[in-house]
């Protein structure tokens, strides 16, 4: 289950999600149609996708925005390209660094077009979030992977080594890095801390101390809510959802190991085979506008990518940023990330 899908259900919103590769939105009788590929939880009632569709169409009445949704992320389009099948979309929204690396390594020609310098507003994106050296992907938000913990049950662990102490035995839930974004980010964070030569030894120690590796974020967070453990790998925006008089805030404390959080920016990119490349770039520019950035942050529960945007409200009050953000760059991951994950899966998950 995707994090945003789970959270929308948990707070009582109507899901209204499309099926795999389904299209949302009906083209008008005239004008242009922009087809945006995105993960399914980007669309539906109350989502960033539906707000963007409505607002963009209001400003561009001759344009219809449709969503092509996928549970398999960019992998579906990598497969289409490798098989010579049509992409049938103009723009992909929701791309992260590892997915871009995968697309570039598996395909002879780029799946995406270079368009970053032609996107109005791209110069306002926080420099630290840029992750495509070829200028194809423009970040539109970011999250920070952290721990969420129950302060009534455990003290905040200060460092990665603290997690190995006896008082944290059987207390940490995480996700499988083979298929989960936060799980992969947490694994990469441990590699960043322990090095490519030391991370597997560290994970062996975590395993000995009872870490539980579950399939995805939703499964892990449900287990945390069921009090199967006192800590879970999650996002530093946890309290945006979980606060108020009817919430035990002690169970939604955010912990930054080593005073850090792992930055996991999301980006958008125009497909190289886009039927409407100029319209795709206009939509990308619209997503970087101050109003859109505030709406995306609030509805995705992620931080804005653009400098100086304050979403305000509950987000402004309860979203926590780490003292230091760490992440791996595109160049760091090329030729490495696949092997790191494969070795981890073979030695840790399979045992």
Where are these regions (language model features)?
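N-terminal secretory signal peptides and thylakoid transit peptides that target proteins
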Residues: 1-19
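N-terminal Sec signal peptide cleavage junction
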Residues: 22-23
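Early extracytoplasmic/lumenal segment of secretory-pathway proteins
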Residues: 31-101
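Extracytoplasmic ligand-binding site segments that recognize negatively charged/polar headgroups
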Residues: 88-228
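A ligand-binding cleft/hinge motif common to bilobed small-molecule-binding domains
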Residues: 98-102, 231-250, 300
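Periplasmic-binding protein-like
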Residues: 143, 204-206, 213-214, 247-272
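Mature extracytoplasmic/periplasmic domains
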Residues: 271-328
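Extracellular/periplasmic bilobal clamshell ligand-binding domains
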Residues: 313-351
């Amino acid at each position: 289950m995707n994090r945003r899908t789970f959270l929308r259900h948990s707070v009582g919103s109507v899901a209204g999600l499309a099926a795999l590769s389904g299209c949302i939105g009906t083209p008008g009788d005239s004008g242009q149609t922009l087809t945006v590929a995105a993960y399914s939880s980007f669309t539906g009632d109350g989502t960033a996708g539906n707000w963007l569709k409505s607002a963009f169409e209001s400003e561009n009445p001759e344009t219809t925005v449709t969503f092509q949704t996928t549970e398999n992320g960019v992998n579906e389009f990598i497969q289409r390209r490798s098989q010579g099948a049509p992409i049938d979309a103009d723009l992909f929204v929701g791309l992260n660094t590892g997915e871009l690396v995968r697309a570039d390594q598996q395909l002879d020609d780029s799946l995406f077009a270079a368009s970053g310098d032609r996107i109005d507003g791209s110069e306002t994106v926080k420099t630290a979030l840029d992750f495509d050296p070829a200028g194809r992907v423009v970040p539109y938000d970011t999250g920070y992977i952290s721990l969420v913990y129950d302060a009534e049950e455990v003290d905040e662990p200060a460092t990665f080594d603290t997690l190995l102490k006896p008082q944290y035995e059987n207390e940490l839930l995480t996700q499988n890095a083979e298929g989960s974004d936060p799980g992969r980010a947490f694994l990469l964070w441990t590699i960043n801390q322990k090095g490519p030569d030391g991370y597997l030894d560290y994970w062996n120690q975590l395993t000995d101390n009872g870490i539980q590796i579950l399939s995805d974020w939703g499964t892990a967070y449900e287990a945390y809510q069921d009090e199967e453990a006192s800590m879970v790998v999650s996002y530093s925006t946890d309290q945006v959802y979980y606060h108020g008089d009817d919430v035990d805030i002690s169970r939604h404390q955010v912990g930054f190991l080593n005073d850090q959080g792992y930055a996991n920016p999301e980006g958008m990119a125009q497909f190289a085979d886009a039927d409407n490349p100029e319209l795709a770039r206009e939509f990308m520019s619209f997503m970087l506008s101050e109003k859109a950035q505030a709406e995306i942050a609030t509805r995705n529960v992620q931080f804005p990518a653009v400098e100086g945007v304050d979403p305000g409200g509950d987000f402004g009050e309860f979203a926590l940023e780490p003292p230091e953000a760490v992440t791996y760059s595109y160049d760091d991951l090329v030729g490495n990330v696949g092997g790191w994950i494969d070795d981890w899966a073979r030695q840790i998950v399979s045992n």
